[in-house]
Amino acid sequence: MKSLIRLRMSSHDAHYGGNLVDGARMLQLFGDVATELLIQLDGDEGLFKAYDSVEFMAPVFAGDYIEAEGEIVNVGNSSRKMVFEARKVIVPRPDISDSAADVLAEPIVVCRATGTCVTPKDKQRGKK
């Protein structure tokens, strides 16, 4: 089971000089993806228990379009193991004009993570 969301990083997301977006924003996106996956599987938002690994691989800037994708790779009694990847798919081109942007021929992986979510048994309403 997979989920994908795509959104534009705004100037509000920029946290550091040079319009750099805080890496924690990618984790927030992964949390949203995980919530959708849990709703699809269990009919409940569940809880994010822990990240097992997080790797930041490339910078993200205001104006970048990011795809965040997640997949449930293992289903336990109440735990759900997930893998996540965030990719930059569109970048602004301020060198051309204030409103120019390019769709990347090859997306740039900006973050990868693995984690575990939990849906308590008494809240699971998914298909059995």
Curated annotation (Swiss-Prot):
GO terms for biological process: L-lysine catabolic process to acetate. PROSITE patterns: HOTDOG_ACOT. Gene3D superfamilies: Hotdog Thioesterase. It is an enzyme of class 4 (lyase). Residues 1-123 form the HotDog ACOT-type domain. Homohexamer. This is 3-aminobutyryl-CoA ammonia lyase. It comes from Fusobacterium nucleatum subsp. nucleatum (strain ATCC 25586 / DSM 15643 / BCRC 10681 / CIP 101130 / JCM 8532 / KCTC 2640 / LMG 13131 / VPI 4355). The gene is kal.
